[in-house]
C-alpha cells in the first residue's frame, strides 16, 4: 500500500472511531433521560403480555391510566399522596410527594413519571393530569363508558361522586 492510501485510510478510520465514540457518549447520556411509557396492565404483564418486556425495578418510566375511585390516601402531616392507577386490567400503586395538579381527582386520567420501586409500585417524581379538550366520537365514548363503569371509574366528563358529596357538605355548612 502506498503512503497516500495509508494516510487516507488512517484519516477515515480516525473519523469513524470519533463518530462511534461520540454516538456512544450521546446514547449513554440520553439513557438516563429516556422514560418509556407504559399502561398499568403493561407494567404488570409486560407489553403484549410478554413477561420479558416488563419494566425492571429501579427503571424510570411514565405510566398513564385512570385514578381508581376510593384509593386516594393523603398524609395529613405532609404532601405525600398514594393512589392506584388502572386501565382495563390490574392496578399499579403510585406514591407521590408534592402538590398535585388542580385537575387531579378520582376517576380522572393522569400520567405519572417516576421510578418503579416494586413490581406494582411507582415512586412518582411528577404527576400530570390529563384533560379532555378534543372531540370524542359518541361510539368511542360509549365504548369507554362500558369499560370504565364496571371498574368503578366515574363519568369522564362529570365530577366524581366524592366531589359531589364534598360540594353538598360545603353547601350544607353555609
Curated annotation (Swiss-Prot):
Disulfide bonds: none annotated. Keywords: Cell inner membrane, Cell membrane, Cytochrome c-type biogenesis, Heme, Iron, Membrane, Metal-binding, Signal-anchor, Transmembrane, Transmembrane helix. Its main location: membrane. It is found in: Cell inner membrane. Residues 1-8 are cytoplasmic. InterPro entries: CcmE (IPR004329), CcmE-like_sf (IPR036127), NA-bd_OB-fold (IPR012340). The keyword Disulfide bond does not apply. GO terms for cellular component: plasma membrane. The chain crosses the membrane at residues 9-29. Heme binds at residues 131, 135. Residues 149-174 are annotated as: Disordered. GO terms for biological process: cytochrome complex assembly. Residues 156-174 have a biased composition (Basic and acidic residues). Belongs to the CcmE/CycJ family. NCBIfam families: PRK13165.1, PRK13254.1-1, PRK13254.1-3. This is Cytochrome c-type biogenesis protein CcmE. It comes from Histophilus somni (strain 129Pt) (Haemophilus somnus). The lineage of its organism: Bacteria, Pseudomonadati, Pseudomonadota, Gammaproteobacteria, Pasteurellales.
Amino acid at each position: 500500500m502506498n503512503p497516500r492510501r495509508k494516510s487516507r485510510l488512517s484519516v477515515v478510520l480516525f473519523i469513524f472511531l470519533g463518530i462511534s465514540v461520540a454516538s456512544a457518549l450521546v446514547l449513554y447520556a440520553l439513557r438516563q433521560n429516556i422514560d418509556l411509557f407504559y399502561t398499568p396492565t403493561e407494567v404488570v404483564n409486560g407489553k403484549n403480555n410478554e413477561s420479558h418486556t416488563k419494566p425492571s425495578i429501579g427503571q424510570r418510566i411514565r405510566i398513564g391510566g385512570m385514578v381508581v375511585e376510593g384509593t386516594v390516601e393523603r398524609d395529613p402531616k405532609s404532601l405525600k399522596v398514594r393512589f392506584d392507577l388502572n386501565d382495563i386490567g390490574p392496578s399499579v400503586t403510585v406514591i407521590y410527594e408534592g402538590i398535585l395538579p388542580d385537575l387531579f381527582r378520582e376517576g380522572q386520567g393522569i400520567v405519572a413519571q417516576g421510578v418503579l420501586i416494586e413490581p406494582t409500585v411507582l415512586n412518582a417524581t411528577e404527576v400530570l393530569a390529563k384533560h379532555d379538550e378534543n372531540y370524542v366520537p359518541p361510539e368511542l365514548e360509549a365504548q369507554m363508558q362500558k369499560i370504565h363503569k364496571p371498574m368503578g371509574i366515574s363519568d369522564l366528563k362529570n365530577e366524581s361522586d366524592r366531589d359531589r358529596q364534598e360540594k353538598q357538605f360545603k353547601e350544607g355548612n353555609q
